From Swiss-Prot:
Main location group: cytoplasm
Source species of the chain: Cupriavidus taiwanensis (strain DSM 17343 / BCRC 17206 / CCUG 44338 / CIP 107171 / LMG 19424 / R1) (Ralstonia taiwanensis (strain LMG 19424))
InterPro entries: Ribosome_maturation_RimP, RimP_C, RimP_C_sf, RimP_N, RimP_N_sf
PANTHER family named in the record: RIBOSOME MATURATION FACTOR RIMP
Protein name, entry field: Ribosome maturation factor RimP
């Protein structure tokens, strides 16, 4: 079984989702997790770390050190479900190919539209001539991350459907 599949299977059984997996030099394995309903606390990271350590031992996964973390305020958006979940939130999107000479966009995500398998994600942004709407498929995205919103009054992130 592929490492990402092994981790994803383990996490889903625990009620978490795999956001990103990173293999760094010197045997470091970084696993970013999330729990859509509640977010991630340090206790969640500890619990997942213990479970993955056991799974890796049984499956003979080669690594030196394991780090389990939340994805942070600037969470990466990788799957269609991420774009659905964070519709209404501000995001930075880098496309694989330029649109009108531009690859980098920052704006408000809109609910995906279109038939299954052909969904288009909308991003409202401030263009040269005023407000504009960019539509793209997940496969068109090189990188996408939420723009961090820090609310010192304790309110949740705007647009987060949690």
């Amino acid at each position: 079984m592929h490492l990402a599949d092994l981790i994803e299977t383990t996490l889903s059984g625990m009620g978490y989702e795999l956001v990103e997996l990173e293999r760094a030099p010197a045997g470091l394995l970084r696993v970013y997790i999330d729990q859509p309903e509640t977010g991630i606390a340090i206790e969640d990271c500890e619990k997942v770390s213990r479970q993955l350590t056991h799974v890796f031992t049984v499956e003979n996964v080669d690594y030196e050190r394991l780090e389990v973390s939340s994805p942070g305020l600037d969470r990466p958006l990788k799957k269609l479900a991420d774009f659905v979940r964070f519709a209404g939130a501000e995001a930075r999107v880098t496309l694989r190919l330029p649109v009108n000479g531009q690859k980098n966009f920052t704006g408000i995500l809109r609910e995906p539209t279109g038939a299954a398998g052909e969904e288009k994600i909308g991003l409202e942004f401030e263009g040269k001539d005023g407000p504009a709407l960019l539509e793209f498929a997940v496969s068109d995205v090189d990188k996408a991350r939420l723009v961090p919103v820090i609310d010192f009054k304790g309110n949740q992130r705007k647009g987060n459907k949690q």
